[in-house]
């Protein structure tokens, strides 16, 4: 009886250890976040920098709640989100369609590549002020900066993805007398989707940069403005709250694309049993 | 469907604007419902012949015809199957098999009915909703075969369809193909590099020379149908294999 | 093992701190705002003519954003910085303990330029006018708020347009009726355009400076309260060095312009202009030997401009004129001295702008005249 009980105990023990390990693994991203917070708290407690340069987490938390309650954060957040939304649609729309055209017609790449490469290798921060002069200090200029920064990765990924479509499957579609639209819808689109979505992850995070760069140039509204204005009022906790909000937007967009991948690319998770 | 090649020549363009002869001139006639295997040394233009018949490759001179109508592009009645199963990894087994019907505008219900009817013959009834990544090489090839059969074509063009499979699977699936063929009686032109396979399956074995491929032998296979695996031990079978091999590699060459 | 590690760490820190200390006694950073510009001439003179060196400083200049200058000084990362008094008030309200020890600009440099048919300027006329401003931040914005307040107006009475630092273009295109400007710079450019008939149908402009209405504290030297308490001698030496460089610049702008050439790459420096400036600088040095009064020196500066204008094209002279006009904002009987009333006026403006809460900050701790008094003649 005792033997059995002992055996039972060890089994139970090993199982609970395993469950614990599993739970630890599941929560490890959370753990790294907690570790980061602890490190931050430790750094501020050590007073290497005065609190007005590196404010403690609690002060940032307070600033967050205050900015939330006063509506300040949401007001500027919604401005930035709107600019990003339209910028993403514009930039992705142009990037995807030009990318597709280039992939199908190599002569286009030959003609357009100097312009596109020049466009890409010029840092947006340098000519963002010009965009503001051309498109005005309203939301349009920020939508354009976002679109410009989003455009390139979506373009390149589209070209790569459409070129990578299996020539054998193209033969198959031809042998089945598929129309150009059917080839696009049933072959090119699903085949290119993984690479295009990977590019979308990059674009999504870049979109935040685009909008914020635009807002830095014209002072008015949006998170870029809020960060400058907080800085000018020596409100470091609010600066950090705003920066973290930008991070949160980028992460949410990234996660949204991951979600799309999960739904649309379910087949990639399948493998031989 | 009757398939005919008349003085067919296919050249390829080389990068320096020259011309590389790949095939022919060659003339060949395949009767309706006949099973013809094409063998020859590698690079003899077997695949080019199949692709030209399928309307995927343009003839440089001469002509190809199906039931005396010149073939200038892909036909719905002429289905081609490649060595690679060539499945769409994002489609399930039934959706891969149903692709030709879907492209032809057949509605979902009728498409599924047609596909599910085929699954048992293909031994795929338990894999209807699997994705290609979950299939073995043999099963993937069965799906590819299903995708060809489902079109109810009058002729099948098979380009080394089992070349990538292991010997056991290959034997098994070859006989399954013969079963299917017996039922539907399409014209079949199959390229293979396996002489045993050719003799076991075909009514006629056509031997091509090395590049540019010309017809060097046309051997009738006088074995009764249905074919069975134990026929390979028969004297007739062995003689036919020897004869075919000699045509590919002439002893005095 | 732990002992060895401890010793290694200690010796590492000793090396580090000795390197730091050595650099400290030689090198001194002064943090400025904006970009290298003729308006920073006293610093160029201070370096070129050894005013800093005579007090034991080997000065390097860095240009940063104003809040960054302030935070670096407050955190002890740099000992000296130049910011406006308004930033000192705002930053002190947010826990940065800095002290303003030397008032460089005696007059607040912002003003408003507007069309004037008779040369007269009336702020009340601004009602319902379109007014351009670089942006709703910094000295331009606080200057405008003060001006409107002094005329009994508020921002709601005018149409405010953010135009960046493009006042001359936007004003002359007629897109705004008035513009907030730096009185030592843009009015000069606009007047030149008016004279050239290149400013729409504008015949005459008028400038109302903030300083003519209200005495607002402006740019000056800041240190951390910690440094002021710990090493007052160092602060005193810097105040003395800067005072001496500022005085030299005010007294001999020709020499100051020449000294600035190495620091401001874009400063016009045609050989003819430089030769003439060298002659003028030498003559001015002789003149200064005679112990002239402040008024006499001011007159000598105007004479310089007349002489130069006869010999050199007016485009090449713009930056020299900017220097002269800026000197007018610096010059005073007692350089460096700061008045509590100018701090109170600024604090009122900031409260009006909603940048400062209602509890009154301790303005008397924001600045100190101790180091100005301590400058030996």
State what each model feature region is.
Chain C
Residues 1-9:
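Bacterial N-terminal signal peptides that target proteins for export
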Residues 230-355:
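Secondary-structure end/capping motifs
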Residues 60, 67-68, 207-210, 275-282, ...:
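Short linear loop/turn motifs
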Residues 23-55, 325-331, 336, 340-377:
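N-terminal hydrophobic or amphipathic helices and topogenic motifs
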Residues 86-87, 166-285:
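Pocket-lining segment of extracytoplasmic ligand-binding domains
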Residues 8-17:
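Bacterial N-terminal signal peptides
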Residues 24-164, 168-173, 177-184, 202-215:
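Short, glycine-/small- and polar/acidic-enriched structural segments
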Residues 100, 160, 249-260, 360-362:
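Surface-exposed patches in mature extracellular/periplasmic domains of secreted proteins
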